[in-house]
Amino acid sequence: MKIFVLLPRIPWPLEKGDKLRAYNQIKQLAKNNEVILCALNADKKANKEEAFKALQPYCKSITFIDISKTSILINLTKAFLKGLPIQCGYFYNKKAHKKIHHLIERHQPDMLFGQMIRVAEYLRHEKTKKTIDYQDVLSMGMKRRSEIAPFFMKPIFNMEYRRLKKYEHDIFDDFDIKTIISKQDRDFIDHSKRDEIL
C-alpha cells in the first residue's frame, strides 16, 4: 500500500514526543508499505539535510514545506476570524495546501495519514481514504492550561479550548480511521462514535 504521511513538523531530531511518535510510525508503516512523506517546517534552523538522511531509509519520497513567520501571523489572524483553533491556523498555509494537494495527485496514494488535528485542514476534504492520529486531546491540554493561567490570559485559553473541542468533533467524520495514544484520551473526544478510535 502507498501511504501519504503529513506531519506538522519535520520528525528530526527526536527531541519532542510528537516527533518521536511520528518517526516510529513512519518506521512501522515502511515495513509493509511505501511511505510518501510530507512535513511542514516553520523552523528556519531545522537541519533539513540531516533530517532527510535520517528519514530516507523509510520513505520513497520526502518533501519539506517551509512556512514563513509572516505567513504564520497572517494565518493566525485568519483562523481567529474564521473561528478555527489558533493551533490549526499556525500550521495552515494556502500555498502549502496547494503543494500538498498536488503531491497527493502526483503520487496517487491508497491512504492519507495526518499526524494531529493541526494538519487535518489539509486532508479532510481529499477523496482518498484517510487516517487522522489525534495523538492526544489538544482541547484537554488547553483546558488544563486555562485553569493555571493568569486571569488576563484565561479568556484566550478558554476560547482556544472551546474551538479545539468543536474542531476535534467536526473533523471526526471526515476521516475513515482515527487513532489516539490512550483510551483515557479517547474518552475525552466529544463525539458519539468515539469508541471507533483505535
Summary of predicted features, one role per range:
Residues 1-63:
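N-terminal subdomain of nucleotide-sugar transferases
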Residues 2, 110-111, 177:
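Structural motif
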Residues 40-99, 106:
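A conserved catalytic-core segment of Leloir-type glycosyltransferases
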Residues 46-51, 121-122, 161-195:
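A short, active-site helix/loop in glycosyltransferases that binds the activated sugar's phosphate group
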Residues 69-89, 131-169:
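Acceptor-binding helix/loop patch of EC 2.4 sugar-transfer enzymes
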Residues 100-119, 128-131:
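Short N-terminal targeting/anchoring amphipathic segment
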Residues 116, 134-136, 182-183:
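Helix N-cap/beta->alpha junction signal
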